[in-house]
UniProtKB/Swiss-Prot annotation:
Summary of subunit composition and partner proteins: Monomer.
Protein's UniProt keywords contain Transferase: yes
Listed name of the protein: S-adenosylmethionine:tRNA ribosyltransferase-isomerase
One GO location term (cellular component): cytoplasm
Catalysis performed (reactions): 7-aminomethyl-7-carbaguanosine(34) in tRNA + S-adenosyl-L-methionine = epoxyqueuosine(34) in tRNA + adenine + L-methionine + 2 H(+)
Pathway(s) served: tRNA modification; tRNA-queuosine biosynthesis
Compartments in which it is found: Cytoplasm
EC number in record: 2.4.99.17
Job of this protein: Transfers and isomerizes the ribose moiety from AdoMet to the 7-aminomethyl group of 7-deazaguanine (preQ1-tRNA) to give epoxyqueuosine (oQ-tRNA).
């Protein structure tokens, strides 16, 4: 299987550069199992598309203002993108500079203080910050929001709110779990009234999510690592949902990545079952992999040749995904982080468009 198998052509004007005025006003392409017809809806229609007893699972990670700028002793400019916080004053980072900084070198930060390069960590660097407060708190004032590279503008005040989900609470992501951006408090209230239950996982989306696949043969691709937590309470929620015949719907690919990373085969469950898990994942989901943990997912439209295109193709089938994407392009849907969404049912769900 090749990277080019997941290419499609997208007009630049369909890449959303800013959010809509209302989160739930985004369009929603409902993609039931083939051969049922696609349906053009809105995210605010979700209460009509889900049933009492269904379980929506969100990623509650919170985006940190993870982009910093500074200057090396030589005078060269440096851009720092924090990948992961490591204690109060250390972090794993990406560094953009004309020359790679050496261990022991210092970077004077534009926001004040300095950072010492401790060394390399694979494709990343380890930095120790000399700043007055713990890094997590200092970044709230000193850092800049790391909007994705395809958003061709500087982040504004509005992005501090809109590039964050309304249920974000666990600090640590450098990119938003974008499917969750469509949910506002009125929509959540209507879903509760409908009898839909909510659960949460945490997956801290890392800077690796912006990295392209650099090899054409996918069996040579090395997936980036991300930290996640699937708690015992969520596992019990899923068990109860299954027991009563409800459906499990992931809000975003990060939730699917979390649940599949916590899926374990046991003697009692040879096909596997969800179990509590906290730690790093490097799971790479592409066609040939069977996603067992969810019946459906709400997800945005993904970049050509990305690992997320591969994941949704594994879930719904490559031909079905490409038919949906071609429909979305023809109907002028908005793409990527600030764009529209899909309600995607798995090939094996047999659940139609979810309407009751």
């Amino acid at each position: 299987m090749k990277k080019s198998d997941f290419h499609y052509d997208l007009p630049d004007e369909l890449i959303a550069q800013a959010p809509l005025a209302e989160r739930a006003a985004s369009r929603l392409l409902v993609v039931p199992p083939s051969p049922q017809a696609l349906a053009d809806r809105q995210v605010r229609d979700l209460p009509e598309l889900l049933q009492p007893g269904d379980l929506l699972i969100f990623n509650d990670t919170r985006v940190i203002p993870a982009r910093l700028f500074g200057q090396k002793a030589s005078g060269g400019r440096v851009e720092i993108l924090i990948e992961r916080l490591l204690g109060e004053r250390q972090a794993r980072v990406q560094i953009g500079a004309s020359k790679s900084p050496k261990a022991g070198s210092l970077i004077a930060l534009d926001a004040g203080g300095q950072a010492e390069v401790l060394g390399r960590d694979g494709e990343f660097y380890l930095l120790r910050f000399e700043i007055p407060t713990p890094l997590e708190h200092w970044l709230l004032e000193a850092g800049r929001l790391p909007l994705p590279p395809y958003i061709r503008r500087e982040p504004g005040v509005e992005d501090r709110e809109r590039y964050q989900t309304v249920f974000a609470r666990e600090v640590g992501a450098v990119a938003a779990p974008t499917a969750g951006l469509h949910f506002d408090e009125p929509l959540l209230a209507r879903l509760r009234e409908r009898g839909v239950e909510f659960g949460h996982v945490t997956l801290h989306v890392g800077a690796g999510t912006f990295q392209p696949v650099r090899v054409d043969k996918l069996d040579q691709h090395v997936m980036h690592k991300e930290w996640l937590n699937v708690g015992a309470a969520l596992v019990e929620q899923v068990r109860r949902t299954r027991a009563r015949g409800g459906r499990v719907i992931a809000v975003g690919t990060t939730v699917v990545r979390s649940l599949e990373s916590a899926w374990r085969k046991t003697e009692a469950a040879p096909e596997g079952e969800l179990q509590p898990f906290a730690g790093e994942t490097q799971i790479f989901i592409l066609p040939g992999y069977r996603i067992r943990s969810v019946d459906a997912m709400v997800t945005n439209f993904h970049l050509p040749e990305s690992t997320l295109m591969m994941m949704v193709s594994a879930f719904a089938g490559r031909e079905r995904i490409f038919a949906a994407y071609h429909h979305a392009i023809a109907q002028r849907y908005r793409f990527f982080s600030y764009g529209d969404a899909m309600l995607l049912w798995g090939r094996e769900s047999g659940l139609g468009n979810g309407e009751s």
